[in-house]
Amino acid sequence: PYSCAPYGADAYPNSLGPSAPFAAAGYIFAIQDVRGAFMSDGEFVDMRPHKPVKAGPADIDESTDTFDTIAWLTANLPGNNGRVGMYGVSYPGFYAATGMIDAHPALRAVSPQAPIADWFFDDFHHHGAFFLPHTFNFFASFGLARDGRKTAWNPGFRHGTPDGYQFFLDIGPLANLETQHLKGQVAFWREAAAHPNYDDFWQARDLLPHLKQVAPAVLTVGGGS
């Protein structure tokens, strides 16, 4: 199984892969930082829009990055049998799903688990209302700009109070979170605030229209909350 994720190689350190039987059966595991995250070069783009038509070899998206990774692994990793599986949970589930678009022939099975697919509705807006605490708390740490390669997570945001409700009540207008706390350090926060409606910005980040003629076997895992 091959996991391609934005959370770093140590995001799930308590186990190797989704279950011990995979390791016992002799599977080879590869964990990769996605483009622009942690130790990978390039520019990280949140929910990078898929490009169904490429202008040339330099025109990339997460699907092409996954294709190239699988091509390299199957050509260079000793002992591999030329068959690859992918899985991911939450944001990593998005990367698992993108990998099965125009998939490499070696990709045989994919399991996106609680994956992001249409981010506007999946996480950031519930019944039309902006899900403020979730969005701010996540991006105030995860969304901080990277200054070169690194292995450590960004520090968590310190609210100055254990009462989260009171923190957001006291902050006043949404713009105050930018001017008082984020101060230009989180690009995606500014983009989300600038696009309160389901416009072209969000529609371009909807993965669902691109999940057509998927070749690998797929097991999607989800739940309710």
Residue ranges and their predicted role:
Residues 88-98:
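Glycine-rich nucleophile elbow surrounding the catalytic serine of serine-hydrolase chemistry
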Residues 19-39:
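Conserved alpha/beta-hydrolase
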Residues 86-88, 113, 221:
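Short beta-strand immediately N-terminal to the catalytic nucleophile in serine-hydrolase-like folds
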Residues 214, 220-222:
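Short beta-strand/loop motif that positions the catalytic acidic residue
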Residues 6-9, 29, 72:
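Serine-hydrolase catalytic-loop signature spanning alpha/beta hydrolases and amidase-signature enzymes
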Residues 43-61, 68-85, 90:
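Gly/Ser-rich "nucleophile elbow"/oxyanion-hole loop immediately N-terminal to the catalytic nucleophile
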Residues 3-18, 24, 46-52, 56-59, ...:
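Accessory cap/linker subdomain of secreted extracellular hydrolases
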Residues 225:
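Acidic catalytic loop of the alpha/beta-hydrolase fold
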